[in-house]
Amino acid sequence: MITQLLCLNILNFVLIEVALIRVNPYFSLIPIRLVGNRIYSFKEAKIMTKIFIIHENSDWLPPFAEALEAEGVEWEEWPLIEGTLDLDAPPPAGIFYSRMSASSHSRGHTASKDYTRSVLSWLESHGRTVVNGRRVVEMEMSKIDQHTALRAAGFEVPATIAVFGHHNLKDQARSMKLPFITKHNQGGKGLGVRRFDDFKSFDEYVDGPDYERPVDEITLLQEYLHPAGGFITRVEIIGGEFLYALTADTSAGFELCPADECADPGTSLELCPVSALPTESLFHWREGFEDPIINRYLDFCQSWGIGIAGFEFIETEDGRLVTYDINTNTNYNPVVEKEAGRSGPVLVARYLAALARELKTDRVLVPTG
C-alpha cells in the first residue's frame, strides 16, 4: 500500500509539472526520475499545425483532400465565395494555401477575387505563412502581370497588345500580324481564347452575339505561335522542385476551346486544342525533359514567392521558346501522373505538411536514461 501511494504521488507530481510546463515553458528544465529509475527531460519537438486551403471550387479538391488525409495532417477547406471578414480579429494559426482561380467568375463567384485579396492581405499583415499569397494572386488574375514579370525576368513572351474596353478592338487588331489570337486578361479555362486568320472575321466576332466580354474589360491581342512538333509544353513546380513536364497535342491546329470542353477537364491548361474528344487524352508526360528553362522557372518562382505553379510554353517552328502563361491553381492530370509515376497532389500535401511542421514547436517529455 505504501509503495502504491508513493508511485501515485510521483505520478501526480509529474502530471502537475507537465501541466505547469504547458502554461510556463520556463517552469523547470530539471530531469524527472520516474518509476523504474528512468529519467525524463523536456526537449523541443516539431508539432504540426493546421493547413487551410483557400478556394472557390470544391470540385477541384478531392485529389488534394485524399493526399492530405494520407499524409496525416489536420486541414480545413476555406471557400471564399461569399462571407464576412472581421479585420479587427487575428487569423487562426496555421498554413494557408491559396488555390483561388482566375476563372472563378465563370462559376458565378464574382466576389471571390476581391474576397481572396482581402483575406490574403489580412493573413499576411498578421505574419501568417501563405503559399501563393497576395502578390501571387495578382499574377493569377492578370495575364498582363504575368507577361510583364516574365519579360522583366528575361523570358521570351508573345507580342501582345492589351485593349481596355470594347470600342478600340477592331482598330487595334489592324496592328497585329495574321493570324492572331484573343484572350481575356483575367482568364483560365481558355476564356476568350480564339484564333483569327483575317480581320473581317474578327470584326464580325466583335460586333456579333458570340463576343465574350472580359470580366475586367481587358482583351489581349496576341501573336499566334506556330508550335513545332504539334504540341505545347507545361512545366509543373511544387515547393521549389520540378515535378514533371506534360504536353498537349496541337496537331489539329489551334482554333482554341475552353478546357472544360476538352478531353481532360481537370487539366487547367490555358491553351486547349479544338480536336479534343471525350474518348482520348490529348495530354501526356514529356519524358526526359531537361531543358535549362526549368531552372529559370524555379528561379522565377523563388523571386516572386510562388510555391506552386505551372508554366506553359511553345517551341515554335522558327526555333523560339516562348512562355505565354503562368497558372498558380494547378489541377493535375491523371493520365500524365500515371505515365510519369509522380503525383502532384501527393507532393503538394507533403510540401504543405513540411511547412506546417516547421511552423510550430513545443516542449515534450522524452526519456534520457
Place the predicted regions along the sequence by residue.
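Phosphate-binding site of ATP-dependent enzymes
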Residues: 194-301
